[in-house]
Amino acid sequence: MKFATVLAFATAAGAAFASPLASSETTEAGQLSKRQSINYVQNYNGNAANFKYDQHAGTYSTRWTNPPDFVVGLGWSPGNSYRTIKFSGSYSSSSSSYSAVYGWLNNPLTEYYVVENYSYDPCSNSGAQVVGSVTSDGSNYKICKHTQYDQPSIQGTKTFGQYFSVRANKRNSGSVTLSKHFNAWKQHGFANGAANPDFNYQVFATEAFGGTGSASMSVSG
């Protein structure tokens, strides 16, 4: 997929529905923080992919055949640096799709993905720069980055960076330790190396821009 295409629907997804739910407290890295239930629904073109969800239960499903661009899923707004996202379910795609943690930073404006399963490798795009790798959660991940010039974003038409971690051992269930990816990306400019990046939303999502497929996921974090 062209990187510009990804951003076109990601922008609209940034305006997806969000409603706060109860949270409990947990300790992370010596700091008291809140561990939230799902409070954000990502739904861009979900009607083209039979998107159904139960926000309280943290589950969603989708099925598509040659769809327009869509991105759907569940997560949190705002995101954070220390969340470990757990996901479990099924994902099958003939082409042009990801199953991934997905989110944005507000400042510096940045789009990011931790790709757990896929039928398209974003790091194979000729415009992507492979900068390294990181080992986390039982697998190696290839890291690549890309700059989008004057493209749609959660802040309108902007120039911004994209970061991707793409898992070698594809999977449909497990835990994603986000701090491992963020720390690895910071070596390549993510968040300008800030200890506490300015997060916008952060979700586990299914994205497709062609082909046929289906997904059914349970998400928590």
Curated annotation (Swiss-Prot):
Task: Please give the residues the UniProt entry marks as glycosylated.
Answer: 117
* Family matches, as PROSITE patterns: GH11_1, GH11_3
**GO biological process: what's one of them?**
xylan catabolic process
Q: For the GH11 domain, which residue ranges apply?
A: 23-220
Entry annotation: catalytic residues: 111, 207
> Null mutant: what phenotype?
Reduces the rate of xylan degradation and growth on minimal medium with xylan.
Annotated Gene Ontology cellular components are: extracellular region
Q: Describe what upregulates or represses it.
A: Induced in presence of Zea mays leaves and by xylan, and repressed by glucose. SNF1 acts as a positive regulator through the release of glucose repression.
Q: Which UniProt keywords apply?
A: Carbohydrate metabolism, Glycoprotein, Glycosidase, Hydrolase, Polysaccharide degradation, Secreted, Signal, Xylan degradation
Q: Which reaction does it catalyse?
A: Endohydrolysis of (1->4)-beta-D-xylosidic linkages in xylans
The catalytic activity of this protein is classed by the Enzyme Commission as 3.2.1.8
Q: What does this protein do?
A: Endo-1,4-beta-xylanase involved in the hydrolysis of xylan, a major structural heterogeneous polysaccharide found in plant biomass representing the second most abundant polysaccharide in the biosphere, after cellulose.
Q: Which family does it belong to?
A: Belongs to the glycosyl hydrolase 11 (cellulase G) family.
Q: What is this protein called?
A: Endo-1,4-beta-xylanase 11A
Specify the species: Mycosarcoma maydis (Corn smut fungus)
